[in-house]
Every structure is written in structure tokens, then in C-alpha cells.
Curated annotation (Swiss-Prot):
This is DNA polymerase. Its cofactor is Mg(2+). InterPro entries: DNA-dir_DNA_pol_B, DNA-dir_DNA_pol_B_CS, DNA-dir_DNA_pol_B_exonuc, DNA-dir_DNA_pol_B_multi_dom, DNA/RNA_pol_sf, DNA_pol_B_thumb, DNA_pol_palm_dom_sf, DNA_pol_type-B. Pfam families: DNA_pol_B, DNA_pol_B_exo1. Binds 2 magnesium ions. The keyword Nucleotidyltransferase applies. Belongs to the DNA polymerase type-B family. Disulfide bonds join 428-442, 506-509. Keywords: Disulfide bond, DNA replication, DNA-binding, DNA-directed DNA polymerase, Exonuclease, Hydrolase, Magnesium, Metal-binding, Multifunctional enzyme, Nuclease, Nucleotidyltransferase, Transferase. It comes from Desulfurococcus sp. (strain Tok).
Length: 773
């Protein structure tokens, strides 16, 4: 199993290293025969001798083309002959490429920016993560001491915790009497002990949570300050910290550094991405949070260190569990794309598609287009019409079906052969013409991207069939990871066409796909309304909610299935409309904002959720009760009564203060905040009292009644004393409870002022409620 690849330099020449796991043992394969190269398209092939004479300087060494060969390739589906120019060292390419490009005989140069080790994996047909080797995994986490205003890495590391299949342990330099704690004498000894643990356990995978941007950099800085060689690589090297966009990325040679943070941000939509806020939705169990100021207080006083050690241990354990959960999926993406898991786990979906296309282009003898320069990038910012959205029918509706197109955009790309190499191509016998925009796509041959996409969808269907057939739960889970990885890639192609930095960028392709999408959804809606008696309540891009007013549930379900039998044979190619669900009740507020309830009383909402931590418990609880009243009981008036009851209790100060706590995270150094929100104001007052506040600290506060700005009246919740303090009921009514329910009840004709307990006026309710069956 290939873990990763890189290159080193020996005697001025590159040596490829392939890090592998074979039969349970780690090994490194070396290849000294692979040469860096680029392609050049010439106006006149006789100019090749002049091209070979071009020189440049790199670190005092003269750089030139070492040899050249003429090769037959394809470019965007058309035959082309190009020159393959070889060089001594990969770093020669950036030193000389502009000089070659500027030669009058050169039309352009290609594939000059593909990293050497990645080029090697593609050209040699090597696929990382293939095989059934069992990889050893170890997760680690650190706790640090931070004082406001300190430079990064100035405060000591207090604890290093780690977890693997044998359990979780904590290394620290204070005596803590717990069975999983190992105490050493100093911070320096703690770091050295951790390095020894890595050496002894020799993991193939190091799992962190934001290790790219915190743990590794902090450990490396403290190691330098303390005179410790921070060697973690299997080749005896220190971790390599490199910039990747606006973030950092850390490589450990011979080991996969699997940072969960970018993976989870790409995979799950959450309001915040702390370890605690991620762990609960993934595993369904809360994880305790110990705040930075509590850690500092415990460390400096010596009281409560057991709790901090337990928290540190549980951090490592949670990171390990999350790593085990997410690693198999990234391994499948790595296999699918053909690049290392280290790269894949830090890539956007657009980059995943691009690496997949680069490999397939090589396999099909295609020269890849270049990435855009700054001028071209600016030109690619022009927008175009997106998917169709029908404004929702207001009111409370019953017996609703949801129908949507199966993989709408991928199906359109394949069915209509939408690809840069088929776009407006002259001399074809047959074209598909996109509605509204008029772009033509040749149907005489399969386009590069539609053919690859078709292969992916076909493979996914085969994998899903295997899933159904197997009785082995482990095999089924692995197959499920595989089909999900394929789905991620397949669903990214439309977005890739519109991705400004893409090699195979095609605005005409993207706007043609959405134009066909609009046509199909609008035609389908018209057919179901005119021929089957449905009323479409809301539609968005690839699906719609519909009902038959006055009909019972069985009638609506049966008629929907009749419609599918009618419409699907009339759709071209891979286009297929599916029955996605039935809901006994629902309402639709505005675009992308609705709530429905199924026959098992499961409520699904979109655009109405208040899951951010800066909503108090009373706001979340009130919204949940309002949704239940409307959807479960079909009673909008009950929902209004609930809101009035809550606002009345708030006004009378009958709501427990615990339900009014607001949590907000400090995301940067306090000195860099210009706007002082309540959480920042509270944090600054805490810091002034000596409590350590750092980025990531979550501030819990409650707003008191009184004059002045909200920030001046917000206090830490643990300082709230019911005997001395009164919370600001008006603040919680106007800024928490009413905003949480107003957009829901507005759909039924209620205004904000109608929802407070002292007002009883109802605005036009009868016009909004639909008859129940």
C-alpha cells in the first residue's frame, strides 16, 4: 500500500521516494530514472534546436532542456503534435519555463506546474491507499498555557495526550494521580517522552484536530526554544510546515498526517467546528469542554488538575474516534483520485476533480489545459443563470410528496454530452442545443468529461449492487465508503465547470447544464399540474414539493407514482425523476426556507434552524415547540399562544437564567477586534482580571437589565446572582425569541408585534390556512 511519495536530490538529480506499507512493514522504494518534463506546442518544429539552446540560471547552475522528443497527443479532443521537453531537476522547470514560453516559435507550454512526485504517481499508474494493509493510527492533542498578548508558542505546553487502539494516555510535568497519566519532571522531558512514544509505537497515521495550524507548529516552536530535535519522520526528519492557501499544512515523512479539521469542514455543515461541537453530532454524545481560563487556573493553583487531565485524555480519545470514522472515506477518495491521502484530505472538491481529470487525461493521451493566469481569472468572474426556484405557496399544507431528479446535473452532462471538447465543435453530424443559451454540443463522439462521468456512475451502480449482495458487514461498509466517494466526485463536475481556477473551465458548459435543468424541472411541474391535478408548492433546482388539494394521503401517493410511470419514459438519456418522500404536513416560507413532517413525526427543516451557539436555550426551545405545534398538531394558533406565553414569562422574569445563556467563541486575538460585541466585551473584562483568553475560548454570558450598550450589560454567566441581578427581558424577547419564530409565523400572516403576550391582534390568518382533509 502506497502511503505517499516525494523526491530528494542526490548529486543534482531527483530521486523519487515512495513510502509504502507491505506485509505489515514500512518501506521506502527509490526511483532514480524518472525525469521531469513539460510539453511545448511549436509553430515551426524546426525551431526545436533553438528551444534546446535556451538557458537560465538556478542557484548558480545553468539550466537547459536536456533532450526533446516529438509526441502525438490530443488537446480538447483534437489531434496535436507537441514536443516533450526533459530537464535534469524539477526545479529547473520554474526557472526556465517563461523563457521557453516567450520564444516566438512557441504557441504555448503545458503541464509545467504539476508537482514532480504527483507527476510520478500519474505516469507510473500508481494508486495510493490500494490494498488491505492494516494501518497503525495514533491521535494526539496538546494543552497549553496562554496569557493575553503573548506571542504564539510563548506559553508552555502543559500536557500531551495520545490515543490509539490500546487506549488513551496523558504526559504532563505535574504530579497527577490518575492511572492514565504519566508525569515527568519538565516540559522538555514531556516533549522528549512524546517523541519516544511515536518512535516506539511507530504509527502509519498521525491524527490531529487542527494540527496543521496549531499543535504541530506549537510543538515545533517549543522544541526549538527548549533545544529538542523534533524528529517525527520515518526518514529522521522534522515535520515540514508549508503554506496551503490561507492555511498551513504539516507533512511528516513516512507517516500520513491526517488533520480532521479540513475534512470535517468539507463534509459536515455546522455552525462552529470545535472538537466538542463536531463530536456530538457525529457520535450522538456530548463532550465536556474545559475552557482555557479553567486550565490556566487549575495549572497555576494546583486545584482541579485531575479534571484537566481527564479532559486532555478525552480530547485525544475523541480525535482518535473521529479519525477512525472519517479516515476510510478519505482513503477511498485517495484511491479514486489517485493522489495521496495527505493531499486529498486537504483538497476542495474542485481540486479532487482536477487531479482525477489529470490522471485520466494522461491515460487517454490528452494534454491537460493550463490553469488561468491573472487576466484570464478576472475574465472568468462573469455570472450566469442558476437553477430554477419556484416561489413557495404560503400556508399550511397536508399530504405532500417530494419528487426530484436523480443526479440531475451529472445526468444532463452525460445525456447531452456537455464538455469543453464537444462545445460548438464544427463539422459534427448531430448536436444537442442547450435551451435559452443556444450552445451546441457535438454528439458524434463521447466528450472527455461526460465519458468519465458515465464511467463513475456506472461503477457506483456496480458497487451498490455488491453492497446489497454481500452479507459481510465490514465489506458492506467499505463498499459504502466507495460509493459515497464516487458520489462526491460525480456531483462535483458541474461546479468544476464553473470553478474559475479549473484547467477544464467551461462557462458555456455550466450555463448550459443549468439551462437544461431549468427546462426539465419546469416541464415536469407543468405536466404534473396540468395532467395529474397536482399543485406544486415549492421547487428548487432539481426537485419539488406537490400535493392534490383536498385529496387523502393514499390518493396523493398513488397519483405521484402514476406520474413517475408517465414522465420517466418520456425523458431522454439518463434523466430520471424519483419519489423521494411523503410528508403529512408542511409549510414553505421563502426560497430555501421550509419545514415538513413525515408519517413517523420526523420534522425536517431547511433555512429555519437556529443551531448557532449564540442562540440561547429559550430561543431554541421556543422554536422547536412552535414547529411541533404547527407540524404535529396542525395548529398555528397554538404556536402563537406558545410564543406569547414565553414572552410573558420572560417579562415576568419567570424563565430560569440557565436558559438565557449565550455562548460565543473568541476567534482571534482580543486586540484585533474593532467591533466590540457582548462576548468580546465580556472577554476583555475577564482578561483584565487575569483570566487567560485566547482564540478558541468560548464566552458564556447573560445580558442584564440597565442603561447603556448591550456589551456593557453583559456579564459572565457564572457571575450571575439572582439575588442581585435581573436579566434584560426585553433584550431576550426582541433579539432571541421573536427572531427565532418570526420568519416561521410570518408565513401565516403574523407580524412580529402580533406575537408578544400583551398584543392579541391576528392579521389575516384565514387567508393563509388551507383546508384540512
Amino acid at each position: 500500500m502506497i502511503l505517499d511519495a516525494d523526491y530528494i536530490t542526490e548529486d543534482g538529480k531527483p530521486v523519487i521516494r515512495v513510502f509504502k506499507k507491505e506485509k505489515g512493514e514500512f518501506k521506502i522504494d527509490y526511483d532514480r530514472d524518472f525525469e521531469p518534463y513539460i510539453y511545448a506546442l511549436l509553430k515551426d518544429d524546426s525551431a526545436i534546436e533553438d528551444i534546446k539552446k535556451i538557458t537560465a540560471e538556478r542557484h548558480g547552475t545553468t539550466v537547459r532542456v536536456t533532450r526533446a522528443e516529438r509526441v502525438k497527443k490530443k488537446f480538447l479532443g483534437r489531434p496535436v503534435e507537441v514536443w516533450k521537453l526533459y530537464f535534469t531537476h524539477p526545479q529547473d522547470v520554474p526557472a526556465i519555463r517563461d523563457k521557453i514560453r516567450e520564444h516566438p516559435a512557441v504557441v504555448d507550454i503545458y503541464e509545467y506546474d504539476i508537482p514532480f512526485a504527483k507527476r510520478y504517481l500519474i505516469d507510473r499508474g500508481l494508486i495510493p491507499m490500494e490494498g488491505d494493509e492494516e494501518l497503525r493510527m495514533l491521535a494526539f492533542d496538546i494543552e497549553t498555557l496562554y496569557h493575553e498578548g503573548e506571542e504564539f508558542g510563548e506559553g508552555p505546553i502543559l500536557m500531551i495526550s495520545y490515543a490509539d487502539e490500546e487506549g488513551a494516555r496523558v504526559i504532563t510535568w505535574k504530579n497527577i494521580d490518575l492511572p492514565y497519566v504519566e508525569s515527568v519532571s519538565t516540559e522538555k522531558e514531556m516533549i522528549k517522552r512524546f517523541l519516544k512514544v511515536i518512535q516506539e509505537k511507530d504509527p502509519d497515521v498521525l491524527i490531529t484536530y487542527n494540527g496543521d495550524n496549531f499543535d504541530f507548529a506549537y510543538l515545533k516552536k517549543r522544541s526549538e526554544m527548549l533545544g529538542v530535535k523534533f524528529i517525527l519522520g520515518r526518514d529522521g526528519s522534522e515535520p515540514k510546515i508549508q503554506r496551503m492557501g490561507d492555511r498551513f499544512a504539516v507533512e511528516v515523512k513516512g507517516r500520513i498526517h491526517f488533520d480532521l479539521y479540513p475534512v470535517i469542514r468539507r463534509t459536515i455543515n455546522l455552525p462552529t467546528y470545535t472538537l466538542e461541537t463536531v463530536y456530538e453530532p457525529v457520535f450522538g454524545q456530548p463532550k465536556e469542554k474545559v475552557y482555557a481560563e479553567e486550565i490556566a487556573r487549575a495549572w497555576e493553583s494546583g486545584e482541579g488538575l485531575e479534571r484537566v487531565a481527564r479532559y486532555s485524555m478525552e480530547d485525544a480519545k475523541a480525535t482518535y474516534e473521529l479519525g477512525k470514522e472519517f479516515f476510510p472515506m478519505e482513503a477511498q477518495l485517495s484511491r479514486l483520485v489517485g493522489q495521496s491521502l495527505w493531499d486529498v484530505s486537504r483538497s476542495s472538491t474542485g481540486n479532487l476533480v482536477e487531479w482525477f481529470l489529470l490522471r485520466k487525461a494522461y491515460e487517454r493521451n490528452d494534454v491537460a489545459p493550463n490553469k488561468p493566469d491573472e487576466r484570464e481569472l478576472a475574465r472568468r468572474t462573469e455570472s450566469y443563470a442558476g437553477g430554477y426556484v419556484k416561489e413557495p405557496e404560503k400556508g399550511l399544507w397536508e399530504n405532500i410528496v417530494y419528487l426530484d431528479y436523480k443526479s440531475l446535473y451529472p445526468s444532463i452532462i452525460i445525456t447531452h454530452n456537455v464538455s469543453p471538447d464537444t462545445l460548438n465543435r464544427e463539422g459534427c453530424r448531430e448536436y444537442d442545443v442547450a435551451p435559452q443559451v443556444g450552445h451546441r454540443f457535438c454528439k458524434d463522439f463521447p466528450g472527455f468529461i461526460p465519458s468519465l462521468l458515465g464511467d463513475l456512475l456506472e461503477e457506483r451502480q456496480k458497487v451498490k449492487k455488491k453492497m446489497k449482495a454481500t452479507v459481510d458487514p465490514i465489506e458492506r461498509k467499505l463498499l459504502d465508503y466507495r460509493q459515497r466517494a464516487i458520489k462526491i466526485l460525480a456531483n462535483s463536475y458541474y461546479g468544476y465547470y464553473a470553478y474559475a481556477n479549473a484547467r477544464w473551465y467551461c462557462r458555456e458548459c455550466a450555463e448550459s447544464v443549468t439551462a437544461w435543468g431549468r427546462q426539465y424541472i419546469e416541464t415536469t411541474m407543468r405536466e404534473i399540474e396540468e395532467k395529474f391535478g397536482f399543485k406544486v408548492l415549492y421547487a428548487d433546482t432539481d426537485g419539488f414539493f406537490a400535493t392534490i388539494p383536498g385529496a387523502d394521503a393514499e390518493t396523493v401517493k398513488n397519483k405521484a407514482k402514476e406520474f413517475l410511470n408517465y414522465i420517466n419514459p418520456r425523458l431522454p438519456g439518463l434523466l430520471e425523476l424519483e419519489y423521494e418522500g411523503f410528508y403529512r404536513r408542511g409549510f414553505f416560507v421563502t426560497k430555501k426556507k421550509y419545514a415538513v413532517i413525515d408519517e413517523e413525526d420526523k420534522i425536517t427543516t431547511r433555512g429555519l434552524e437556529i443551531v448557532r451557539r449564540d442562540w440561547s436555550e429559550i430561543a431554541k426551545e421556543t422554536q422547536a415547540r412552535v414547529l411541533e405545534a404547527i407540524l404535529k398538531h396542525g395548529d398555528v394558533e397554538e404556536a402563537v399562544r406558545i410564543v406569547k406565553e414565553v414572552t410573558e414569562k420572560l417579562s415576568r422574569h419567570e424563565v430560569p437564567p440557565e436558559k438565557l445563556v449565550i455562548y460565543e467563541q473568541i476567534t482571534r486575538d482580543l486586540r484585533s477586534y474593532r467591533a466590540t460585541g457582548p462576548h468580546v466585551a465580556v472577554a476583555k473584562r475577564l482578561a483584565a482580571r487575569g483570566i487567560k483568553i485566547r482564540p478558541g475560548t468560548v464566552i458564556s454570558y447573560i445580558v442584564l437589565k440597565g442603561p447603556g450598550r448591550v456589551g456593557d450589560r453583559a456579564i459572565p454567566f457564572d457571575e450571575f446572582d439572582p439575588a442581585k441581578h435581573r436579566y434584560d427581558a426585553e433584550y431576550y424577547i426582541e433579539n432571541q425569541v421573536l427572531p427565532a419564530v418570526e420568519r416561521i409565523l410570518r408565513a401565516f400572516g403574523y407580524r412580529k408585534e402580533d406575537l408578544r403576550y400583551q398584543k392579541t391582534k391576528q392579521a389575516g390568518l384565514g387567508a393563509w390556512l388551507k383546508p384540512k382533509t
